[in-house]
């Protein structure tokens, strides 16, 4: 299983070109907006889910019976779930528990406390990170982009699995 350039193009078309402003603005608040986006997103994958002839793609393979409906349904469903509940923010928050945060106090050489650590601090609670998965110590623009990148990784992984195994 791997992501092909074709798959990445379909993903970009579905998530950035075909998605309307209304879908983008409301998909985390409204299931109808999330569903409209997920369906339009999945439709971008039709060329990759159609049967291929030994000579490559052919218009005759656009018959409904030749479409891998299970792959399209999986792509649509996972896209709906990931976007509707903005699952990437949970992953961004949870990953910070893989290694606890440590504060190191830097004192000038010769100071009696030089080289000593202040100790461990707990990770930020969900209430401080629920928007993007990152707390306020991360610049807002960076927190949003890191969440978008994580979101894209989840979509590409789900799509690759669907195209490889369904």
Question: Which residues make up each language-model segment?
Answer:
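Hydrophobic alpha-helical transmembrane segments
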Residues: 1-166
């Amino acid at each position: 299983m791997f992501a092909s350039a074709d798959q990445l193009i379909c993903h970009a078309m579905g998530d950035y070109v075909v998605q309307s402003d209304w879908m983008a603005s409301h998909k985390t608040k409204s299931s109808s907006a999330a569903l409209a986006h997920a369906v339009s997103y999945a439709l971008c994958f039709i060329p990759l889910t159609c049967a291929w002839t030994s000579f490559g793609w052919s218009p005759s393979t656009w018959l409904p019976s030749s479409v891998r409906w299970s792959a399209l349904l999986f792509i649509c469903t996972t896209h709906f779930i990931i976007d509707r509940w903005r699952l990437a923010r949970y992953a961004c928050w949870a990953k910070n528990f893989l290694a606890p945060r440590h504060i190191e106090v830097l004192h000038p050489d010769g100071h009696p406390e030089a080289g000593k650590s202040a100790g461990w601090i707990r990770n930020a609670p969900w209430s401080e990170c629920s928007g993007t998965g990152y707390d306020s110590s991360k610049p807002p623009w960076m927190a949003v982009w890191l969440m978008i990148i994580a979101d894209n990784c989840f979509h590409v992984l789900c799509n690759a699995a669907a195209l490889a195994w369904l």
